[in-house]
Amino acid sequence: MCPSIETLSGSPFVETIRIEKGRIHNLPYHNARMNRTRRELFGAREEIDLAGYIHPGPHQERTKCRVEYTREVLQVEYVPYRMRPVHSLRLVTCDEIDYSYKSTDRQCLNDLFAQRGGHDDILIIRDGLLTDTSICNVALWNGTSWITPARPLLCGTMRAYLLDKGLVQAGDIPVEDLPKYTRIRLFNALIGFGEIDEITRIYAVSYTHLRA
């Protein structure tokens, strides 16, 4: 069973931030999401700027900066990042999942990920619509534009950046419309747009669509 918002508020929340060549990527988007979570779940009115907590200078290779917080910042850690190759996805359905806040409690996502079988990751369907993989937002190419689901599980920071820059457009993608798209990209705060663009198959009972 997926945890409720009330249950999640008892777990720390997290921002995972890309550091590379001594630079913090998309920090304003991380600040905005963290402060929105603090305000909506903890009633915090004062805003926090993570620039005062993160020390990017020593990190030249791509690094995952992991900031755990509730009302206040709890801890900051740095881990070298290695991108996991993804070439195939398995469609899984869960209408009850709610991951609108980036919590450290990922049990529901982990349970769904365990259903991937021999495939690299999952693509989650909620209420008949495409949402996210276990760790990424997605965008699909319709021949003229990149469309990202309008109702993702989590509104990611890279997704927000791409929307602001006009590089993707938001729209509903019913699962039965998959044949209308020819490519799919996965992205998140650590994975740039276009870095995972070699997915050749999406698998389900009756879906084996998309081509590279």
Regions found by a protein language model. Name each.
Residues 138-139, 154:
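A short acidic/small-residue loop/turn micro-motif
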Residues 131-137:
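Short beta-strand/strand-turn micro-motif
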Residues 208-212:
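Conserved small/polar residues in nucleotide/adenosyl-binding loops
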Residues 126, 134, 142:
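A cytosolic small-molecule/anion-sensing beta-strand core signal
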Residues 1-129, 145, 151-206:
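Conserved alpha/beta cores of soluble small-molecule-handling proteins
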